[in-house]
Amino acid sequence: MTALRLLLAALLALPVAAPAASRIEAAPVPPEMRSTAFTVKVNGVPVDVAHAAASYEYVSFDGAGPFEIEITASEKGFWERGVDIEPWRLGLRPVREGQTIRFRLAGPAKLSISRPRDFLNYAKMLFLFAGAPLPPMPRKPEIHAYQPGVYRGSLNPKSGETYYLAPGSYFYGSLNLWKVHDVKILGRGTIVYEGNQDPTSDEGWRQLPDWHCVGALEARNIEIDGLTCIVRARTLSIQMKDSFGFTYDDLRVIGGNPGNANQDGMDWLGGGDSVVRNSFFRASDDVFALQGNWDGYSDEDMLRPGHDVENILIEHSVLSTSISNIVRTGWPRKTFNSRNFTLRDSDILHGGIGACGQSFAVFGLWGANGAKGSHTNYTFENLFLDNWYSLAQMEQEIPGLQGFTFRNIWALDQPPLVESTLTGDGSSVVFDNVKLGQRRATSNAELPLAVSGGAHPAEFVAPHGPQAAFTVEPPVFRAGEEVIFTATPSAHARYTWLFGDGTEAAGRRVRHRFPDAEGTELDGARTGAGRFRVLLHVEDESGHQDWAAEGLVAIGSWHEAEKVSAATEPGLDWQIYPGTWSELPDLNAERAVFAGDSSGLQANPQGFTHYAVAWNGYLDIPADGGYSFHLLDRDGARLVIDGVEVAKTGPPFAQVCNAPGNAMRYDLGSLGLHAGRHRIHVEGLHASSQGEPRLLWEGPGLPLTEVPAAAYSHLRRDAVTSSGRN
């Protein structure tokens, strides 16, 4: 018995091994598709990287997981600004060593890997598709089987046929489903579409064979599994006209074109009865679009009534666009009806930027300028918002909108950049547990939502089911110090924590130490404090769930408050720099022509319409802690605190379809600040858009909110003895 106890003790003392890495299957990429922008290893095995479109690359392999991922960028210093691995819901953070990042992936997933807030049409992005093991090819003599290799020409199946596209099979052409029924496309093949559409105008709407990656006309009962669509032309990626009964599973669509337009992910022109599941889309326009028809831009074409679109389900998918909406219904002057649309259990990685007449959103319904039709019973449920622009833009006047539900919408870190709108004859619009971080929106102001044009007030549903919320103790901490997380109790619930540093825990009350001050996106070194995206998932025994998120700052170095002995007064002083710059210039090389002061980020340009502004003064920090600052502006803005550049918005991004001005741009940064006054310097460009920069802050005991005027002060003019600029 003693020997048995000693053996048991020895076994218990052994370290617990991590799950063994799984075997993977990865087909070779043909030389003409191979990319050198990144090299990738999975479980130590090199996997070919393929070039998709624009500056997008992708890698694809199959296995059960787990997977040890190693990615090396060829561009020197590529990861120095940080790393953004999405979906954020997965809580992934890599280890960075020079040009290489490494992380562990538990199982099959579809990822976007880029640098923080770099996801527009010229971004360098790597998409990673870790697929579940592929079922064997069906053994039927009538199957058209294509082995690995390069094929030049389109696929034109006939009714009743099944095509099997083996992993490693590449087709330069289209999949044409023209008046066919009961067709199956199986396997893991790739279609590369390089059409001859005019790259400077919209010809992609046409319903023609060989005009899209997948084109369908009056097709019925189609199943497409495991297909990758690469779209390099300015055309709709997948178009279905008056077609019904389509099922897509494990679809991967990547589109990019220099015009950054008219490259939707999937369009219905009439028809429906469709299911899209477990799929990935990167579009250069709307990801999904519902129209009754589209026959051209003449008055006759625009006013011709279209066919109904109905019964569409999209679920368990990962969605991204470089510019437009995730889902769009309608268009000005168009007439058609739609009903029974559901998007659920999906991740919105990149939810548009700017406007085309109407601001872009997760959901846009644009029934303006005499558009007619009834649109009913739309549900958006269990959606995770990463980088997004607005939630909903809805306008329909004749006869109207009814039955739109937004339930369990979780914005995990970033605030909305513009408000949502509801205009015209709209009713029964319901917001049920729309959350921004930990805060649940309970009113128009909290969403925010603007209601006009006779629309009925939106309904905000009272809390029900499990509630995800948590506290942090202590609220201020340095890297390596213990932090206690406590979730609000929910009946019969399980609690799962993702700390944003690549680790997880379970339980209502857990302890954790953040390993460094780099933050989830590995961008904290430049400011001395890292923001970790902490997520809490609460699920009860019936499967009802809720999520909460909060950005917590681990402090690496403190910034001391400044002792100000001279007399001060409220507000900031400012200087005006006239000029016709297209981007924010280096104001150290420019000369201000006049100055003044204001209560906050306002200025009087005295008639100038093209100018830059610099605001200077002090920011009063209420308590010691880690603070995050969110900067929003259309033409370009920059924030400096205590001489450290905290945030700088990206270059101006023009709105389209004659919408005036530039899109709202966004950046954020974090600092460890002691209570008291800290020097603040803000720059803003006024070139083609209206409005001044917006500055929001959050910190210990301080929810995300606009920096109030009371927090600003500046030296009284008679106390100024010297001048300078950060």
Residue ranges and their predicted role:
Residues 1-9:
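Sec-dependent signal peptide recognition
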Residues 115, 538, 682-684:
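Conserved structural position at the C-terminal beta-strand
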Residues 110-112, 484, 531-535, 626-628, ...:
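Short, conserved beta-strand segments of beta-strand-rich sandwich/propeller modules, principally
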Residues 21-465:
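Extracellular/periplasmic carbohydrate-active domains that bind, remodel
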Residues 9-18:
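Hydrophobic h-region of N-terminal signal peptides that target proteins for export
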Residues 464-558, 609, 696-701, 719-726:
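Extracellular/lumenal mature domains of secreted and surface-exposed proteins
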Residues 545-546, 551-552, 556-726:
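Acidic/polar, compositionally biased interaction segments
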Residues 63-68, 478-484, 624-626:
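Short coil/turn motif common to extracellular beta-sandwich-like domains
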